[in-house]
């Protein structure tokens, strides 16, 4: 009898599951229902809380939810979609590759797709800039590439400590988290990350204080308590840290300090690179020559996972397989990444467009700040990586929520989430850009 009841319970559950599956397959569960996400997905989910609709389609700078409502995207996958959603050329290249039975997963084996990506990158990006780097393909996330960069720096120099900066953000895995400044993320590690000394970023002590002088002094002083590190890691524009843009002179000073102390310079260009700050590399305007460059996010062109290191040849001290990962050979991402290089980077047109569009956005943000002088709003950033500092996280949250209600997707950043971060696709047309800025302007006015 007991077994019969168990059988009946099993059959009842099976019947319920079949009914639910049929409902899912018949689309009855759709129309922007978030029930599945709220009931099945972990509490760690984030963006679906900020933007509580089900996004279904996208093209360029426009998103559509399941009900067909349109949203202007000034988030771009947090910097992944510099060229917008679903570029037709990228999709065509990817589709042709898939139909040809091209290798999709290949570990780090030699494939035509990887060869073409490296050759395109070398010919289009590196050689015209007088740069010589070797490629290291890491796991699919930027954090994994940061891990590889830190490991390589320690292996190449024989030193162990790393210098990072206040408000820096480099990823969520333990090594990357150790060089990340934000306490909210660091606390989630469960133990205090070690081996990192944090120094004040440019402007941290105000515009009149050159924090690089402090760094130079403590490194030169054997009694400062700060060891000469294996590497200094930095973002030239801090994204998650609040759109803090370092001055050219400060960056050049950091590079001089690295050279004088035999320290490797790692530039994390995961978010600021691939044209977001103007040039392909965000450090070009300062004339830097980093020892290691970390790239991810927009490097694949259309949102496919890909990350890599660019390292100077003399630093290639790895033994075979010493840093590996199952998904370090995303060949479809190589295909779309090469397509992006061919389409956008064989001349300076996109860089010029980014700088001009950035000026338009910055001027509009200054108008917003001027209109609301009582709240001491301010504008920050470079290129099309810009932010509106609202002073408090609560005000920024109200503005972002109102903007979403009006059809604009934009997020917050900074230590207190007090900065509204604008990352529209670099290819956004003027009409869409102005519509988005109009919504933001109205949302600020309605929230103050």
UniProtKB/Swiss-Prot annotation:
Keywords per UniProt: Aminotransferase, Plasmid, Pyridoxal phosphate, Transferase
Transferase as UniProt keyword: yes
Domain of life: Bacteria
Protein name listed in UniProt: Uncharacterized aminotransferase y4qG
Family per similarity comment: Belongs to the class-III pyridoxal-phosphate-dependent aminotransferase family.
Recorded GO MF terms: diaminobutyrate-pyruvate transaminase activity; pyridoxal phosphate binding
Organism annotation: Sinorhizobium fredii (strain NBRC 101917 / NGR234)
Cofactor annotation: pyridoxal 5'-phosphate
One Pfam family named in its UniProt record: Aminotran_3
Residues recorded as bearing N6-(pyridoxal phosphate)lysine in the entry: 297
A biological process from GO: ectoine biosynthetic process
PROSITE patterns: AA_TRANSFER_CLASS_3
SUPFAM superfamilies according to UniProt: PLP-dependent transferases
EC number assigned by the record: 2.6.1.-
Keyword 4Fe-4S: no
Record Gene3D superfamilies: Aspartate Aminotransferase, domain 1, Type I PLP-dependent aspartate aminotransferase-like (Major domain)
InterPro entries per the UniProt record, alphabetical: Aminotrans_3, Aminotrans_3_PPA_site, Dat, Ectoine_EctB, PyrdxlP-dep_Trfase, PyrdxlP-dep_Trfase_major, PyrdxlP-dep_Trfase_small
